[in-house]
């Protein structure tokens, strides 16, 4: 058993968990980037005169933008939680 109280098995399990978290973080950052790009594209579409003067099209674009905004917030929340958990785990391993 290590001085920190973590057994070799615990350290191995935590390192595996850390790798999974790092992969998930990469996935989240990519999804966040894609969502931000799509939000920007929809804002540009909504700003076009032919779209904002067409109530149906403007409504559709606004709803899509709302959906993307909610998704972005959700992804950011998950990412922030993941980063905090990852940092705690790294601290535990550093003390091992």
Protein language model features and the residues they cover:
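Charged, heptad-repeat coiled-coil alpha-helices that serve as long linker/dimerization "arms"
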Residues: 1-96
């Amino acid at each position: 058993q290590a001085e920190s109280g973590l057994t070799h098995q615990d350290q191995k399990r935590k390192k595996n968990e850390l790798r999974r978290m790092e992969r998930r973080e990469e996935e989240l950052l990519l999804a966040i980037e894609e969502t931000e790009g799509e939000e920007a594209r929809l804002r540009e579409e909504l700003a076009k005169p032919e779209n904002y003067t067409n109530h149906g099209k403007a409504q559709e674009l606004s709803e899509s933008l709302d959906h993307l905004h909610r998704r972005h917030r959700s992804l950011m929340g998950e990412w922030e939680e993941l980063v905090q958990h990852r940092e705690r785990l790294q601290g535990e391993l550093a003390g091992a």
